[in-house]
């Protein structure tokens, strides 16, 4: 899921798909409990969860979840059977993250409750992501990749299309009349694409 979401954000999409009984929805906030709110710590926890699986895995992530999934597929190409990246970035847009963090500073603490994060943790996490750039490592991804982006997701559509160009064995699908949170805005349409 994305930073402003939780695993329940996927319920409507999952209900519409034939998801494996062994599928798991991870909570990003729970993965950081008791740890520093940094991308490195979050990725370490995410990797640990993925490493628990004995067989190849299919990873599906939106926004921050897509960044984590892509990072894992780069580091463990033999472990990832397929990837679904929704509203994905492979090189963090520094200016956009700066603006986002400025807005986070202005928002009340209560606005962060549904995320499961404290305001300071969200600001810290976003700050540590500014330098992420997987451009030189994309060639390591060896599995099939479905890249999905909403038609109205101006911040991610261009990059998602670029990512499709850079990854071998990838396919881009644009969800019409949909913005950034495809799993919330168009769960039925997303479920069809995921089948």
Which ranges hold each PLM region?
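Conserved acidic catalytic loop of the alpha/beta-hydrolase fold
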Residues: 40-57
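Gly/Ala-rich beta-loop-alpha elbow adjacent to hydrolase catalytic centers
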Residues: 61-69
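Flexible "cap/lid" loop of the alpha/beta hydrolase fold
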Residues: 70-75, 80-110
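Hydrophobic, aromatic-rich cap/lid helix
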Residues: 110-134, 152
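Conserved alpha/beta-hydrolase "acid-adjacent" motif
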Residues: 154-160
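Catalytic histidine-centered segment of alpha/beta-hydrolase-like enzymes
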Residues: 178-187
């Amino acid at each position: 899921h994305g930073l402003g979401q939780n695993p329940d954000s996927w319920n409507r999409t999952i209900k519409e798909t034939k998801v494996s009984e062994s599928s798991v929805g991870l909570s990003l906030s729970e993965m950081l409990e008791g740890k520093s709110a940094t991308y490195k710590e979050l990725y370490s926890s995410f990797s640990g969860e993925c490493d628990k699986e004995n067989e190849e895995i299919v990873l599906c992530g939106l926004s921050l979840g897509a960044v984590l999934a892509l990072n894992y597929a780069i580091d463990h190409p033999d472990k990832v059977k397929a990837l679904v990246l929704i509203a994905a970035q492979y090189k963090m847009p520094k200016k956009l993250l700066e603006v986002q963090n400025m807005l986070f500073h202005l928002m009340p603490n209560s606005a962060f409750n549904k995320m499961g994060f404290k305001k300071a943790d969200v600001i810290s996490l976003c700050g540590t992501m500014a330098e992420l750039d997987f451009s030189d490592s994309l060639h390591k991804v060896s599995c099939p990749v479905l890249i999905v982006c909403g038609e109205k997701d101006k911040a991610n559509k261009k990059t998602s299309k670029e990512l499709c160009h850079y990854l071998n064995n990838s396919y881009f699908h644009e969800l019409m009349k949909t913005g950034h949170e495809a799993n919330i805005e168009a769960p039925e349409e997303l479920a069809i694409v995921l089948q």
